[in-house]
């Protein structure tokens, strides 16, 4: 989706060197949309970045990269490129981008700060999860797993009609071999209390 007019007024630290911000997104009926930042040796990295107020954005005088899990999560990436120097990385095959990203990626592309791209088709063909190992392993799942807000149950993405039935659930299964301490969704916030258990429960519930 494109950039909103509403901007988040603050960020919250949710793990060491990791921050989160969110808005009630009028484009999707007021459901929660979320973004994250990770401080790394390669600089500050934003994931699916929503707009911040100028006061909140002052926390980030320089942003090295904006990583997108899918093209429609470009959100405020281009503003962060222009104002903060961010390089925008988007999946190859992304559609609807307002301009050309600095780099396209696929599974296996070397990403900054040891981020790993994992192709997870379902919401669309060129959809990715991003895995970042570290003192706390973080899994960003984009739109594969969402919820309306932080108090709502997890939902698995519907399969895009042109993709084979069950592909979203297969993508979810591919993530269950990973070890992670923090699950970050692009809609519905994050889970830091048994995040893998939450995905296992969702997988079993959607059988």
Segments predicted by a language model, with ranges:
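Pre-active-site segment of Zn-dependent metallo-hydrolases
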Residues: 23-65, 100
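Metallo-beta-lactamase
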Residues: 2, 6, 13, 18-20, ...
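Short acidic-hydrophobic, aromatic-tinged amphipathic segments that line or gate anion-handling sites
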Residues: 102-112
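Short, well-ordered alpha-helix to beta-strand connector turns
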Residues: 63, 84-85, 101-102, 179-180
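Short, charged, surface-exposed secondary-structure boundary motifs
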Residues: 57, 76-78, 96-104, 149-151
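Active-site metal-binding motif and surrounding structural segment of the metallo-beta-lactamase
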Residues: 51-94
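Residues that act as N-cap/strand-start positions at coil-to-secondary-structure junctions
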Residues: 8, 30-32, 99, 105, ...
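Residue-level detector of beta-strand structural context in well-folded domains
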Residues: 12-13, 34-36, 107-109, 128
């Amino acid at each position: 989706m494109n950039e909103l007019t509403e901007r988040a007024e603050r960020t919250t630290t949710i793990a060491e060197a990791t921050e989160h911000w969110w808005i009630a997104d009028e484009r999707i009926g007021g459901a929660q949309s979320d973004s994250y930042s990770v401080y790394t040796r390669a600089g500050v990295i934003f994931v699916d970045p929503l707009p911040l107020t100028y006061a909140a954005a002052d926390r980030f005088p320089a942003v090295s990269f904006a990583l997108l899990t899918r093209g429609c999560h470009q959100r405020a990436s281009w503003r962060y490129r222009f104002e903060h120097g961010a390089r925008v990385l988007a999946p190859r095959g992304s559609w609807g981008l307002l301009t050309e990203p600095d780099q396209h990626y696929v599974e296996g592309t070397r990403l900054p700060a040891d981020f790993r791209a994992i192709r997870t088709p379902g919401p669309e063909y060129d959809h990715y999860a991003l895995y970042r190992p570290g003192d706390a392993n973080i899994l960003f799942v984009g739109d594969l797993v969402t919820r309306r807000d932080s108090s709502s149950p997890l939902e698995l993405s519907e399969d895009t009609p042109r993709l084979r039935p069950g592909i979203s659930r297969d993508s979810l299964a591919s993530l269950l071999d990973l070890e992670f301490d923090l699950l970050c969704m692009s809609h519905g916030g994050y889970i830091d209390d048994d995040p893998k258990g939450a995905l296992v429960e969702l997988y079993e519930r959607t059988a």
